[in-house]
Amino acid sequence: MSNIEKQTGELQEKLIAVNRVSKTVKGGRIMSFTALTVVGDGNGRVGFGYGKAREVPAAIQKAMEKARRNMINVALNDGTLQHPVKGVHTGSRVFMQPASEGTGIIAGGAMRAVLEVAGVRNVLSKAYGSTNPINVVRATIDALANMKSPETVAAKRGKTVDEILG
């Protein structure tokens, strides 16, 4: 829906979606709002939050706090990904692959916001299946969390980085 960008300290915050939801009770409907946000330092740390409240600002604030609490570290390679990765969450599937310098972020909607705040500058990506923003964000973060640097893989296998890279 709307993309509000704010910087607090070294963290970048992006609002991905605000949604009005209702609960039907005997006396009518109770309206509330949900907010989906992502937070990142632009250098490999990223997290998302989902907040719900009776007012929009309160929902956004809750979502931002949850995003700051749920941050993960992503091993980036000079502003792009280490290797092609796939992520899945419920009906959403995302595929991302590294891109050469100058390509930019080729991604749509919710995925673009996650990649921007994570500090990815060049990437090719595609979302398949459900494009529900919550599921796409979760799938994107799943893919980024599953990405491993050559140094990590080499250490786990007990080999040198040159042996891993061929």
UniProtKB/Swiss-Prot annotation:
Keyword RNA-binding tagged: yes
SUPFAM superfamilies: dsRNA-binding domain-like, Ribosomal protein S5 domain 2-like
Database matches in Gene3D superfamilies: 3.30.160.20, 3.30.230.10
Residue intervals of the S5 DRBM domain: 11-74
GO biological process, one term: translation
UniProt keyword list: Ribonucleoprotein, Ribosomal protein, RNA-binding, rRNA-binding
Domain notes per entry: The N-terminal domain interacts with the head of the 30S subunit; the C-terminal domain interacts with the body and contacts protein S4. The interaction surface between S4 and S5 is involved in control of translational fidelity.
Homology family: Belongs to the universal ribosomal protein uS5 family.
Protein name: Small ribosomal subunit protein uS5
Source organism phylogeny: Bacteria, Pseudomonadati, Pseudomonadota, Gammaproteobacteria, Pasteurellales
